[in-house]
C-alpha cells in the first residue's frame, strides 16, 4: 500500500491541518495515560522542523448534550503537549469562528495551535445532538479544510475506521492528504502481517465475546497458518464441541456458528484443553484447574497450564504473530497467568526475528499492565480500527489518504 506520507509534502510556511488521536483518559483535569499524545510527537515535531504551522484536530470522549462539553475540553491536553514540546501550544478553545481564524492567521512558522474538541460540533448552540463531526457534515469538513493551505496530515489511526468531518471530511476538501508517521507505521505492520506475512503466520485471539471477533476469526483463518483462540470466547467453542463449561461465560446464540467455524477450519483452529476456574467472579477465591470440561458451579477465568504449553508449541518457530485479546481475566492477578505467559513467549519470538504485532484494545492494556510492552515489534494504538483492519475491511480514514 503506497500512500502519501508527511515526508512527501512541502511544508515550509504552510498551515498544515493535522488529525491526531488525543482521546486520552482525563480525570479532574489530569491526564491518566498520555501514550497517544507521545505517539503523535514525531509527526508534529517533523512538521514544525520543516517550518510548517501545525493546526491540530482531535476528539475527546463522546458529547451528546451541552453539559458534556466542559468536562471534555482539550485544554489539559494542550497544556500537556506544550510541556512535551517545550513551546507554547496556542489554544483558542474554539472549533470555529473569528477567534479561531484570527489565531490561525497570526501563527508563525514552527508554531502549534490546537482546535477545541471536534465533538463539540456534535451538539449545537441550542443543545441539540446534531452530530456534525461524527456524522461527517459536509459543510463542517469544508470549513475546517479551508483553515489550512490545502494540506492535511492524518496521524489518527485510532479513528481510521470512522468517517468523521475531522478526518474524511477534511481529506475530501484538500488536494493532498498524507499519513503521519504513526499512521504509516500502523498501516505498514498491520497490512504486511495480514496481506503479506512471513510464514508461519499464527494469529492469537482472545477476549470475552465470539460476537466481537467473528469476522476477525473468519478473515484470519483464510490467511494465517494457525489461529489460536483463548479467553472467554473459547467457552462458546467448548460448548459447541459438547464439552462441559460449568458456569463459564458463553454465547448460546453463537454455538452453531462456532460449530460451523470449527468444521471449516479443521486443525487450523487451536483451542484450550484446560482452564483455571473459580466458583465466583472474584480474585480472592480458591481456584482449581480442570481438564476436559468444567463442573457445574465453577467458571473458567483463564487458560490452564496444559493449554499454555499447547499454545506455546503452536507458536514455536512462527515468523509473524498477530495477537488480539487476553487469554483470561488479566485484571485479576489469579487469572492473569495465561495472558502473561503467552505474552512473554510471543515477546521472545521477536528476538528470534519474528514480526509480533499486538492489535489494540484489551491486549494493549494487558501488555502495558504486565510490563512487557517493549518486547513486541509493534503495538497498535487503535482498538476498533485494528480490529476492523484484521477483519479485512477498508477503513475510511485510510482510504481518504492520497496514493503516491
From Swiss-Prot:
<dbReference type="GO" id="GO:0006096">
    <property type="term" value="P:glycolytic process"/>
</dbReference>
<dbReference type="InterPro" id="IPR015824">
    <property type="entry name" value="Phosphoglycerate_kinase_N"/>
</dbReference>
<feature type="binding site">
    <location>
        <position position="36"/>
    </location>
    <ligand>
        <name>substrate</name>
    </ligand>
</feature>
<comment type="pathway">
    <text>Carbohydrate degradation; glycolysis; pyruvate from D-glyceraldehyde 3-phosphate: step 2/5.</text>
</comment>
<comment type="similarity">
    <text>Belongs to the phosphoglycerate kinase family.</text>
</comment>
<dbReference type="GO" id="GO:0004618">
    <property type="term" value="F:phosphoglycerate kinase activity"/>
</dbReference>
<keyword id="KW-0808">Transferase</keyword>
<dbReference type="GO" id="GO:0005829">
    <property type="term" value="C:cytosol"/>
</dbReference>
<keyword id="KW-0547">Nucleotide-binding</keyword>
<keyword id="KW-0067">ATP-binding</keyword>
<feature type="binding site">
    <location>
        <begin position="21"/>
        <end position="23"/>
    </location>
    <ligand>
        <name>substrate</name>
    </ligand>
</feature>
<dbReference type="InterPro" id="IPR015911">
    <property type="entry name" value="Phosphoglycerate_kinase_CS"/>
</dbReference>
<feature type="binding site">
    <location>
        <position position="331"/>
    </location>
    <ligand>
        <name>ATP</name>
    </ligand>
</feature>
<comment type="subunit">
    <text>Monomer.</text>
</comment>
<dbReference type="GO" id="GO:0005524">
    <property type="term" value="F:ATP binding"/>
</dbReference>
<keyword id="KW-0324">Glycolysis</keyword>
<feature type="binding site">
    <location>
        <position position="162"/>
    </location>
    <ligand>
        <name>substrate</name>
    </ligand>
</feature>
<keyword id="KW-0963">Cytoplasm</keyword>
<feature type="binding site">
    <location>
        <position position="119"/>
    </location>
    <ligand>
        <name>substrate</name>
    </ligand>
</feature>
<dbReference type="InterPro" id="IPR036043">
    <property type="entry name" value="Phosphoglycerate_kinase_sf"/>
</dbReference>
<keyword id="KW-0418">Kinase</keyword>
<dbReference type="GO" id="GO:0043531">
    <property type="term" value="F:ADP binding"/>
</dbReference>
<feature type="binding site">
    <location>
        <begin position="360"/>
        <end position="363"/>
    </location>
    <ligand>
        <name>ATP</name>
    </ligand>
</feature>
<feature type="binding site">
    <location>
        <begin position="59"/>
        <end position="62"/>
    </location>
    <ligand>
        <name>substrate</name>
    </ligand>
</feature>
<dbReference type="GO" id="GO:0006094">
    <property type="term" value="P:gluconeogenesis"/>
</dbReference>
<feature type="binding site">
    <location>
        <position position="213"/>
    </location>
    <ligand>
        <name>ATP</name>
    </ligand>
</feature>
<dbReference type="InterPro" id="IPR001576">
    <property type="entry name" value="Phosphoglycerate_kinase"/>
</dbReference>
<protein>
    <recommendedName>
        <fullName>Phosphoglycerate kinase</fullName>
        <ecNumber>2.7.2.3</ecNumber>
    </recommendedName>
</protein>
<dbReference type="Pfam" id="PF00162">
    <property type="entry name" value="PGK"/>
</dbReference>
<feature type="binding site">
    <location>
        <position position="300"/>
    </location>
    <ligand>
        <name>ATP</name>
    </ligand>
</feature>
